Amino acid sequence: MPLFALLGGIALAGLYLPWLDRAPSVMRSLLKTLPVAVFALGSLIAGAPLLAAALAASALGDLALSRDGERAFLAGMGAFALGHLLYIANILQLSGNANPFFFEWAAIPFLLLAASTEIWLRPHTGALLWPVRLYVVIITAMGVLALSEPDAPLIALGAASFVLSDLLLAIFIFRLAEDHPARKSVSLAVWITYITAQALLAEGLLTQVSPG
């Protein structure tokens, strides 16, 4: 994507850091939403509308998750699920360097991690059980498919970073008490791995679409 969009999005992500643990506000929502929205704009300028759509869906998810309440959480999770489905569509459009053997090998850790959520996450999700389960299936599919492209390391790293970010977010939301001393550190790690994931996926997909 254009350098201004990549660096601008990263800079905006840095500006959001002091707002990570503040109460919801218009400014907090704006700062949380803008980084990936700028990535989306850069991807659109670079001639990748499907990638821009995936990033735009994620930006809407950021906006929803910047607010409090179950409805906002469900809206955010739905937006990110759509974003992952659009990432899947982007990956499927690649020229066809997928390695079936690598695909099967790469699936193992992702499937094991997804299955493990039935042990450490499911009992804590309450009424959100089935939305969370569906989201786990979708992001697992995106991660496995991304790792099936051995000639696209940025895509693989981006997907892995996204899975790590969502793993940490699940721990933050469902497993850590409000007064847990690790909450600030986990919140910071979620944001860093998330922005890293979006930047890597965007750059990786654009590189594959326009090699060289």
Language-model segments: what does each one mean?
Residues 1-212:
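Polytopic alpha-helical membrane-helix bundles and their juxtamembrane interface segments
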